[in-house]
């Protein structure tokens, strides 16, 4: 059995990160990645089935850990809905924000690849599915607890989409981690006040 050349794998990963970060998934070239790594394109295909697989290998976010953390958040949202307790609702929002802030800080470049450089990839499709499911769950959460018959729930989807765009803009602009922390602190004030007002609007007949 041939011994895997880990040094070569490291060169491929380094070259791939540089190429995808600069050009994004759609415009990145496997030929250029192979050349930067000092191998042939054919040799690259012996390790990765194609560009999608190589791109996905660069994103090693701790999905299981994030999922477990979000499960705790879901329980808080459930509690706030059952009790109609705005303080528990705000606590859930804070915890959810902390999860994403920590992810941005710990895996900054991978988040850039995921949110800003994945257009056209299978990774982008998976992310879009996750976002769509999140929209659906959030809208359902508010519908179940709402006493306000005139509330337009399309607004919830638009607000959530705006928040996602906010995260994407932070990554697009290439701010330092220190600046991201400052920006997120200001955003938290805005987000928490807005959601608190929406919550109160929903539970008022």
PLM features per residue range, with description:
Residues 57, 72-105:
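Hydrophobic alpha-helical connector segments
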Residues 58, 62-66, 93-96, 100, ...:
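Hydrophobic/aromatic residues within well-ordered alpha-helical segments
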Residues 1-4, 203-204:
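N-terminal intrinsically disordered/low-complexity leader segments
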Residues 30, 59-74:
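Short, basic, alpha-helical segments at the C-terminal edge of helix-turn-helix-like DNA-binding modules
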Residues 99-106, 119-146, 154-164:
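Amphipathic alpha-helical packing segments from all-alpha helical-bundle domains
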Residues 2, 17, 111-131, 187-194:
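C-terminal/domain-terminus segments
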Residues 113, 141-191, 198-205:
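Hydrophobic/aromatic-rich alpha-helical bundle segments in the mid-to-C-terminal region
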Residues 11, 15, 19-53, 57:
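Helix-turn-helix
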């Amino acid at each position: 059995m041939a011994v895997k050349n880990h040094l070569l794998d490291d060169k491929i990963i380094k070259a791939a990160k540089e190429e995808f970060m600069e050009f994004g998934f759609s415009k990145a070239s496997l030929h250029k990645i192979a050349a930067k790594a000092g191998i042939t394109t054919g040799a690259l295909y012996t390790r990765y089935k194609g560009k999608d697989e190589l791109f996905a290998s660069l994103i090693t976010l701790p999905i299981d850990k994030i999922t477990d953390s979000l499960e705790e958040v879901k329980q808080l949202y459930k509690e706030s809905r059952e009790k109609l307790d705005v303080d528990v609702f705000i606590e859930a929002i804070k915890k959810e924000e902390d999860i994403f802030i920590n992810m941005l800080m710990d895996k900054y470049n991978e988040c850039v690849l995921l949110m800003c450089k994945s257009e056209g990839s299978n990774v982008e499709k998976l992310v879009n599915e996750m976002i769509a499911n999140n929209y659906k769950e959030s809208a359902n959460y508010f519908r179940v607890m709402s006493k306000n018959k005139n509330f337009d729930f399309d607004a919830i989807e638009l607000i959530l989409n705006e928040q996602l765009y906010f995260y994407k803009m932070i990554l697009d602009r290439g701010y330092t981690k220190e600046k991201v922390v400052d920006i997120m602190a200001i955003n938290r004030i805005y987000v928490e006040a807005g959601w608190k007002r929406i919550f109160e609007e929903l539970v008022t007949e």
